[in-house]
Amino acid sequence: MTSETRTLYSQLPAIDRLLHDSAFLSLRDRYGHTQVVDLLRRMLDDARDVIRNTQTLPDWYADWAQEAKLRLENAAQSALRPVINLTGTVLHTNLGRALQAQEAIEAVTQAMRAPVTLEYDLDGAGRGHRDRALATLLCRITGAEDACIVNNNAAAVLLMLAATASGKEVVVSRGELVEIGGAFRIPDVMRQAGCTLHEVGTTNRTHAKDYRQAVNENTGLLMKVHTSNYSIEGFTKTVEEAELAEIGRELDIPVVADLGSGSLVDLSQYGLPKEPMPQQLIAAGVSLVSFSGDKLLGGPQAGIIVGKKAMIAQLQSHPLKRALRADKMTLAALEATLRLYLHPEALAEKLPTLRLLTRSEASIREQAQRLQARLAARYGDEFALEVKPCLSQIGSGSLPVDRLPSAAMTFTPHDGRGSRLEALAARWRTLPVPVIGRIYDGRLWLDMRCLEDESRFMEMMLK
């Protein structure tokens, strides 16, 4: 160690002296003695590293309290930070998918604040079943005999297979062996459930005879998987759920379906692309149908299974059900969301997912033009601001080839340097409420479809 290094080390303050500084007293009141002391030890270690590597004091040496305050504030921020989603993807998996309705938010708050009748029967003063209230709602909406709730649709598929076909073959079309995010693959789930995959047909064409010929003494299920995150077009043939259900009845083999996104309303009435609905499959005779709670349904993350009472009973009694069951906050939010479907006339207004998906291109464009005029003075020296047509996507593997006409505010650097776009996007990500857009074709695009809180957006953009 050089004499210069020793001299610099000697200038570092003692923790005890810092703790008695008035600025640190206020930090101790706010964050606690233990947390502040731990931070000061780390700061001293950092300072020694700087001295050892650069032979200089750290640039924050003159104001330890301010540096400590910044570090404590950053550490206190939640890992789940609110952001402004202007990516153009409404159900953005990385940004938490569906926004919750106000009714769902209030229901969750109530469930957290007080004991609730999660598994308590007020009439009989004994133990109840946590899925009962939601099962009643789901049966009313879908026409099913019974229902089961777990924590996501992947869990729903796993439980469905494990409880009804473990040790048996499950017949699926090759064109429906989907993979979703996180490498969730139907063949892998079957293996985990103890089932044997029996593929039939080809990637683009599967016929009714393929299912019939595949059935043997070890067949447990016939399965349909909705290819919600990709599309096969051209020379294609699939067996519809109603026809497969008829085959199942003829051969006395249950038919189950994984719908993935799972919309509970006919989206075409809102000018959106059609998506198969659970109630249609139930009416067609499918024994069990699984779908997600946090995609097109617009609720919390959950896996929902509706279908025949006897088969739902198998699911409820399986050991996996307890491991996969939903908690009281999920159930509270899902119940409140499902109740909105009982008033379909107000659904597009009250359900955020549907409200955002049904925004007109004209209203989005008007909003973008109005906000662009207010932001021109802030960004106009470096960037050309324009309002351009764009296409939003639904996201989360829902309706993968369909796009929604929208409008975006675009930022193009006057000097044409792409690095300026990267720097601008990075700067927006450091805002107290980060603004998330996308860089494409030499521009930074802010798709306005999902912007509802204009005042917060403008506050962030003008910082």
UniProtKB/Swiss-Prot annotation:
Q: In which pathway does it act?
A: Aminoacyl-tRNA biosynthesis; selenocysteinyl-tRNA(Sec) biosynthesis; selenocysteinyl-tRNA(Sec) from L-seryl-tRNA(Sec) (bacterial route): step 1/1
The cofactors named for this UniProt entry are:
pyridoxal 5'-phosphate
What Gene Ontology molecular function terms does this protein carry? L-seryl-tRNA(Sec) selenium transferase activity
State where it is primarily located.
cytoplasm
Recorded protein name is L-seryl-tRNA(Sec) selenium transferase
Q: A Gene Ontology biological process annotation?
A: selenocysteine incorporation
Instruction: Tell me the Pfam families matching this sequence.
Output: Se-cys_synth_N, SelA
User: Cytoplasm: is it a keyword of this entry?
Assistant: yes
* Keywords, in A-Z order: Cytoplasm, Protein biosynthesis, Pyridoxal phosphate, Selenium, Transferase
How this chain assembles, per its entry, is:
Homodecamer; pentamer of dimers. Binds only one seryl-tRNA(Sec) per dimer.
Q: Which reaction does it catalyse?
A: L-seryl-tRNA(Sec) + selenophosphate + H(+) = L-selenocysteinyl-tRNA(Sec) + phosphate
Q: Where in the cell is it found?
A: Cytoplasm
What's the name of its gene? selA
Q: Which EC numbers does the record give? A: 2.9.1.1
